[in-house]
Every structure is written in C-alpha cells, then in structure tokens.
C-alpha cells in the first residue's frame, strides 16, 4: 500500500462529511420556503414511519408557502400531524388532498439561533475531517513501521493530509458564511 492509496481511501470519507454537512444545513430554515425543510419529516403510514416524500409530492408554491400533494387522501391528517410534530415551527393546513405549509418570517432571535446551529454543525463536520486526518496519519505510521514506506513518504503524506483537511475546512467555512447570509437576510 502506498501513500496515494491511503489518501484515496480517506478522501471519499472527507467528501461524505461535506455532503452530510450540506444535507444538515439544508434543513435549517431561512426566511424562504424550500422543500429541504421537510426532508427529515417522517409520516406514520401503513404501520411504519415513512419519509414525507414517499407519501406525496413536496413543492414550493411561492416564497413563503410549501405544498404537499398527498397521493392517498386517507393520509392527509397523518401528513399534517407529522409536519406539526416535527418541531419546525410550521403550521400546516389541509385543503383537499393538498397540505399547505406557510413559512412564517423568522424573528431576529430565531435567526441567531439558526446561525448558531449552522456553526455548530460546521464545527462538528470540521472535527470529523480532523478525525479522518488522524486515521490517515495513523495508517501512514503503521506503513512506515512495516517498512512499506519511507519516512519522507510518510511526511509527504502528512502534508497532503493537512492540505486536504485545510481545503475541506475552507469549503465548510464558505458554506457556513453562505447559510448565515441566507438566514440573516430579511
């Protein structure tokens, strides 16, 4: 196993960390309606918990309104309940087979809470990246002990690991700044 092999094994895990962070912050409310707000909503349907997307079409009607076109009319009440119980601060209303969700404007206090939450998710993701770097360095140390790579190769690998972590941490910082801007926009 070479330094390149170790890095190629760890880099996809770092990319997954970035993807998970993107998914995490997509569900944080901004002042605008987005279908990502409802990604985590689970509906009690047919005896099990199902993602909202599996019981209806989720769409954006306008900047402040989402809609869920429920496929099975008997599920409308369950969809309403699931959205209300998801602790998103949303109040859905049924209209035939459609559930409308109006997105209330965020208060200044709530905006600050969401910014803080975004930063917390970002910091958790950065810690995860550093853990991946630690794993990579541990792997390089092991290879050096087994005489599979030289000390120079190990040091070069550590520098590459640091560069990778720096690149992805910078990406996370940019994503936090973008999300903060979206949240604070009135």
UniProtKB/Swiss-Prot annotation:
Kindly give the InterPro entries that the UniProt entry links to this protein: Ribosome_recyc_fac, Ribosome_recyc_fac_dom, RRF_sf
Q: Which GO terms fall under biological process for this protein?
A: cytoplasmic translational termination
Q: Which GO terms describe its cellular component?
A: cytosol
Where in or outside the cell? Cytoplasm
Keywords tagged on the record: Cytoplasm, Protein biosynthesis
| GO MF assignments | ribosomal large subunit binding
Tell me the Pfam families matching this sequence: RRF
* Residue ranges of coiled coil: none
Keyword Protein biosynthesis attributed = yes
Query: What Gene3D superfamilies does its record include?
Result: 3.30.1360.40, Ribosome-recycling factor
Q: What does this protein do?
A: Responsible for the release of ribosomes from messenger RNA at the termination of protein biosynthesis. May increase the efficiency of translation by recycling ribosomes from one round of translation to another.
Family from the record: Belongs to the RRF family.
UniProt name for this protein: Ribosome-recycling factor
> Native species of this protein?
Chlorobaculum parvum (strain DSM 263 / NCIMB 8327) (Chlorobium vibrioforme subsp. thiosulfatophilum)
